[in-house]
């Protein structure tokens, strides 16, 4: 049976989109593995540099949590790096569409995503499931390993710089150091008194048994304009 024009177009789209997205995924996955190796090296180097300068209980600890997640604990801050398994295109109002590199070829806009979250380490240690964290950064990688970063203090490669450089270890170190620096200076805020002044005996006992008085850092996907 001969392919009708529409079917032919569908088949061509399947081939082109699948090839494009697979390339983006492969680049993002390779970058995430590079990120994990860089994190491990940074944690080891900084831990050695801190030796003798502070309590041994305050260390940098790297944890590999599988193919798509890694963590680094710095004092009471826990940074979680998570690679999304899907490939994305940007909304029509995103700044990326003003970038000449993307305007020259729409396929350049398809990106893989690595999220950077900031939590309190005790939230996981004591299973405080109600505690909140904060998305502090995102790394985007495309089919050509070109990249840019969004988030708090991520100034190394903005959306309008997308296409100028391939992501490598130097870029990863800059992104990771910015994320760690921000997390260390993002202190826990005291909850308002009015939100905590009344508690039942059952609530108190339950929370004490599980160390679950709600604390934490905010979680959200919205960045301020100056962060993008």
Regions found by a protein language model. Give the residues of each.
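Glycine-rich, aromatic-bearing surface loops/beta-hairpins
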Residues: 135-228
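Short, charged/polar micro-motifs that form catalytic or ligand-binding hotspots
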Residues: 18, 22-36, 158-169
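Residues that form generic nucleotide/phosphate-binding pockets
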Residues: 13, 17, 42, 175-178, ...
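Intrinsically disordered, low-complexity linear regions
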Residues: 2-9, 55-57, 62-82, 104, ...
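Short, solvent-exposed secondary-structure capping/transition elements
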Residues: 44-55, 82-83, 90-92, 188-192
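N-terminal, Lys/Arg- and Ser/Thr-rich interaction peptides
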Residues: 1-22
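Hydrophobic-cavity lipid-handling domains and compact docking modules
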Residues: 56-145, 149-157
């Amino acid at each position: 049976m001969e392919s009708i024009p529409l079917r032919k177009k569908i088949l061509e789209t399947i081939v082109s989109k699948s090839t494009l997205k697979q390339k983006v995924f492969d680049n993002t996955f390779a970058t995430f593995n590079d990120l994990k190796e860089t994190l491990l090296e940074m944690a080891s180097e900084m831990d050695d540099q801190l030796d003798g300068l502070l309590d041994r209980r305050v260390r940098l600890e790297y944890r590999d949590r599988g193919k798509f997640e890694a963590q680094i604990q710095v004092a009471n801050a826990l940074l979680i790096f998570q690679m999304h398994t899907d490939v994305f295109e940007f909304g029509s109002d995103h700044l990326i569409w003003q970038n000449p590199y993307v305007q020259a070829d729409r396929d350049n806009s398809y990106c893989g995503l690595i999220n950077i979250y900031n939590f309190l380490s005790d939230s996981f240690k004591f299973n405080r499931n109600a505690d909140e964290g904060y998305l502090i950064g995102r790394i985007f990688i495309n089919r050509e390993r070109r990249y840019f970063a969004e988030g708090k203090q991520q100034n190394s490669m903005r959306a309008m710089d997308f296409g100028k450089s391939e992501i490598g270890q130097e870029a990863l170190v800059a992104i990771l150091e910015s994320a760690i620096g921000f997390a260390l200076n993002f202190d826990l805020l005291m909850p308002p008194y009015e939100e905590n002044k009344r508690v039942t005996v059952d609530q108190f006992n339950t929370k004490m048994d599980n160390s679950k008085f709600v604390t934490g850092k905010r979680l959200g996907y919205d960045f301020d304009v100056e962060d993008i």
